[in-house]
Curated annotation (Swiss-Prot):
Its cofactor is Zn(2+). Keywords: Hydrolase, Metal-binding, Zinc. Its EC number is 3.5.1.15. Binds 1 zinc ion per subunit. Zn(2+) binds at residues 13, 16, 105. GO terms for cellular component: cytosol. Coiled coil: none annotated. This is Probable aspartoacylase. Belongs to the AspA/AstE family. Aspartoacylase subfamily.
């Protein structure tokens, strides 16, 4: 067995209960999941929030891993201390160091199974290209959004998020569990292939690059004055063009997409995600792009997993 360790995180948000439930079943029956001969560490990201059945206690744990927050001694939120605990125990220089972190989430949006990467770290892009090639999952590349930062997986040399939906918060769902299992198996299989030099990389990677967040239209008191338009509700990953309706009020007033040229396509994701209401995000707008898989991506991942 390789000395490489992979950290699997569930329950980073305490009201996303499917992956934590799956981890508990795995603990009771270790043959449930094929580890592909990889050293695995599993952890509940925010156990207190999970016990309380809410997204977080004091602040979003998945926005609490900024370096300035981790280095600060003047913080008192429960999630600040939890972020420090996780990095101290499982970070690359921790007591039980892991090289890759995979953070399992669920979403109320119709995202299906998808992967999320933050920025353009070569090793991240290499591993998700393999998983996409195996399962065909869409990839959301989140970058250039200073208001949303400090994500858990960024504290590890390589890491990404698995999102599965739609499912209401706090609800166990058979299909969500199955999709999570399928994606987890693919993740571990592809990591094992890299470690054992059995990898065949695709020529290209398809990403949906983050452009901007879009809020609901609001009235003078800050209350949403329109609803997500019926033609895009539940249609994450479907392209739309300039002039397409995004929102509609009860009186029929439309808010249109006014972005780019007339024929340019954009792809909305995380449409009407319940957890993002507090962040004033009704959806995120992305641009679908096809990138050639680069040698430096492959080399970085190989060096990380075969030191």
């Amino acid at each position: 067995m390789s000395g490489i360790q992979v950290l699997l995180v569930a329950g980073t948000h305490g009201n996303e209960i499917n992956a934590p439930w799956l981890f508990e079943q795995w603990k009771q029956k270790d043959s449930l999941i094929n580890t592909h001969n990889i050293n695995i560490q599993t952890v509940i990201g925010n156990p207190v929030a999970l016990e309380q059945g809410k997204r977080y206690v004091d602040r979003d744990l998945n926005r609490s891993f900024r370096k300035d927050l981790l280095l600060s001694s003047d913080l008192n939120a429960a999630e600040h201390f939890r972020a420090l605990e996780l990095v101290s125990e499982y970070g690359p220089n921790g007591n039980n160091p892991c090289q890759i972190a995979i953070d399992f989430h669920s979403t109320t949006s119709s995202m299906g199974s998808s992967l999320v990467v933050y920025g353009r770290r070569p090793a991240d892009l290499a591993i998700v290209s393999l998983i996409q090639n195996h399962l065909g999952l869409p990839i959301y590349l989140h970058e250039g959004d200073n208001a949303q930062s400090g994500f858990l997986v960024e504290s590890w040399p390589c890491g990404f998020v698995v999102e599965v939906g739609p499912v209401p918060q706090g609800l166990l769902h058979f299909q969500i569990i199955n999709q999570t299992l399928l994606t987890l198996d693919s993740c571990l299989k592809e990591i094992s292939n890299v470690i054992n030099s059995k990898t065949v990389y695709p020529e290209q990677l398809i990403v949906h690059r983050h452009l901007k967040n879009i809020d609901f239209p609001r009235d003078s008191s800050g209350v949403p004055s329109s609803l997500v338009h019926k033609d895009i509700q539940g249609r994450d990953w479907y392209p739309i063009k300039n002039g397409h309706p995004l929102f509609e009020s009860l009186s029929g007033d439309l808010t249109l997409l006014l972005e780019g040229g007339l024929e340019e396509e954009f792809v909305p994701v995380f449409i009407n995600e319940a957890a993002y209401a507090e962040k004033n995000i009704a959806m995120s707008l992305t641009k679908k792009e096809m990138w050639d898989v680069q040698k430096d991506w492959i080399n970085d991942l190989s060096k990380l997993l075969n030191p």
